[in-house]
Amino acid sequence: MMDGGKGFEDALTGEQKIRNFNINFGPQHPAAHGVLRMVLELDGEIVERCDPHIGLLHRGTEKLMESRTYLQNLPYFDRLDYVAPMNQEHAWCLAIEKLTGVEVPRRASLIRVLYSEIGRILNHLLNVTTQAMDVGALTPPLWGFEEREKLMVFYERACGARLHAAYFRPGGVHQDLPDALLDDIEAWSHTFPNVLDDIDGLLTENRIFKQRNCDIGVVSEEEILQYGFSGVMVRGSGLAWDLRRAQPYECYDEFEFQVPVGKNGDCYDRYLCRMEEMRQSISIIRQAIAKLRDCPGDVLARGKLTPPKRGDMKTSMESLIHHFKLYTEGFHVPAGEVYAAVEAPKGEFGVYLVADGTNKPYRSKIRAPGYLHLQAMDHVARGHQLADVAAIIGTMDIVFGEIDR
């Protein structure tokens, strides 16, 4: 005998078995952060199984890259983690520069650091405030988006685009920054900590926020190593692993900054890490601006990878030919394999590039940090309440551009 309302009833003993029920979380759920569909198996209110279904935003980026030149591939990286686009371009440029042996001018290197840190703040502001909204705090996103708007304007003033920048180029950056922009970024860096303090005051000691985040989604050191986590997911559990410190790239070894780490590895510690990382990024931004003022010069390594100066093209035939070849055929990268990684806001964003000596990559594998974090969702969410799923996804910091790619 079966009655849907009661579950199964054993005819002999009269015992009832209650069936777990499955629900779909997403793909249009506001807390799903994009097009995530999760099939949750619930026993009452407890999550027994959590099955993420991905691929709803798959565009075949890695395959498309094999039929484009190296420069044409750069804009694909803006469309991966579209919350902080320049950090992704950085990894692609570093991979090409490693293979070609190009040395980036110091001024370009400083500009890259400056904009990578602006990207980090863009990302953490969005994450901290929307995660607060997922657990019921409605004010932080309104404050956070006001600051993000100012940062978007800095993006726009550097390269003309608010979102898909294509500003970092192999060999440097596309254009130099005007002095007025540096002044404005510096002025902003002195007012922003007050906004951080306001968000801090709203959330950090808030009883409801703490109850929703403390001891939720705890990740241990063993799990970090097994699942291949990176970024805040590692640092929230007390491991001070930051590529800017552990394997310095660009000119990060010249900067003074701390690597914030948590203690308990739960959602609350990850929130605290992100808040402190924004303060550290402000410190790096101020140092970068001070260094940029003392460091005039070119922002592109003039050579085979980058276009000649406009003035040269008007007088030199070779420069004109070089410009034409560069933008029709593209530059050639010597055959070889290389892995380049940057500490993106979400974790270690890496590019494994296989070049065959032509003007197009033979194969490139993109290591998106969010992909590995989402893989562990079943393991981390099991045994939690249904309402905690939103909190866990929020602190994993998931964006679907990079997961589905």
Swiss-Prot record:
Disulfide bond sites: none
* Pfam families referenced in this protein's UniProt entry, alphabetically: Complex1_49kDa
One molecular function GO term is: NADH:ubiquinone reductase (non-electrogenic) activity
> Recorded E.C. number(s)?
7.1.1.-
Give the location in the cell. Cell inner membrane
**Quaternary structure note:** NDH-1 is composed of 14 different subunits. Subunits NuoB, C, D, E, F, and G constitute the peripheral sector of the complex.
Family that this chain belongs to: Belongs to the complex I 49 kDa subunit family.
* Protein name per its UniProtKB record: NADH-quinone oxidoreductase subunit D
